[in-house]
Amino acid sequence: MRLYLASTSPARLALLRAAGIEPVVVPSQVDEPAAVAAAEAEHGPLSPDAMVQLLARLKAEAVRGALDGEPIDGLVFGGDSAFAIDGALHGKPHRPEIARERWRAQRGRTGRLHSGHWLIDHRGGVENAAVGATAVAAVSFADVTDAEIDAYIASGEPLEVAGAFTIDSLGGPFIRRVEGDPSTVVGLSLSTLRDLVRQLRIEWTELWNRAGVSL
């Protein structure tokens, strides 16, 4: 069973590989700010869960048709993440000054990482069904110093990740505690994805296709 990953996120790819799955990576072209603005114009402000679920769905739907002229035959997964603290929603900071401001505000405190999941059953080259769910993990930060923040930002790592932090790389020592599925903080909740796969009446182990992994 093939799993198509509608994302270029190295973290999501690494998670799936570690779980025994070698996905087919299909970059998804979604104008996220425009999509959120359009949804809010129609429905009003989106909750964090609603926003990440919307973007996860749009990413999956954007690549469900064909890949290099070949029909997609398998499951298509789209994911999105955002970090919320004090009622403010934080995506990727992109710029060092924004990442620095966020870290100075969140150090020593706790926020919530929201992760949206959307899975399309596209076996046989046609859409048979689609399911989605969100996962939330509480993240407590260490009371990091200004020097640590500056060094972390200089590495470039926090600029292109939701909330300006990672748990599986340089940012790991700055995370004091995680409540919830730890993989949620990395990029997708593996337990949530397994639940969605089973909702489609597919066994999770049918997705195992990495070298050295067999039933």
Curated annotation (Swiss-Prot):
The active site is at 80 (proton acceptor). The keyword Hydrolase applies. Keywords: Cytoplasm, Hydrolase, Nucleotide metabolism. CDD domains: Maf. Its EC number is 3.6.1.9. InterPro entries: ITPase-like_fam (IPR029001), Maf-like (IPR003697). One of its GO terms (molecular function) is nucleoside triphosphate diphosphatase activity. It catalyses: a ribonucleoside 5'-triphosphate + H2O = a ribonucleoside 5'-phosphate + diphosphate + H(+); a 2'-deoxyribonucleoside 5'-triphosphate + H2O = a 2'-deoxyribonucleoside 5'-phosphate + diphosphate + H(+). This is Nucleoside triphosphate pyrophosphatase. NCBIfam families: maf. Belongs to the Maf family. Its cofactor is a divalent metal cation. It holds the Pfam family Maf. It is an enzyme of class 3 (hydrolase). GO terms for cellular component: cytoplasm. It is found in: Cytoplasm. GO terms for biological process: nucleotide metabolic process. The keyword Cytoplasm applies.
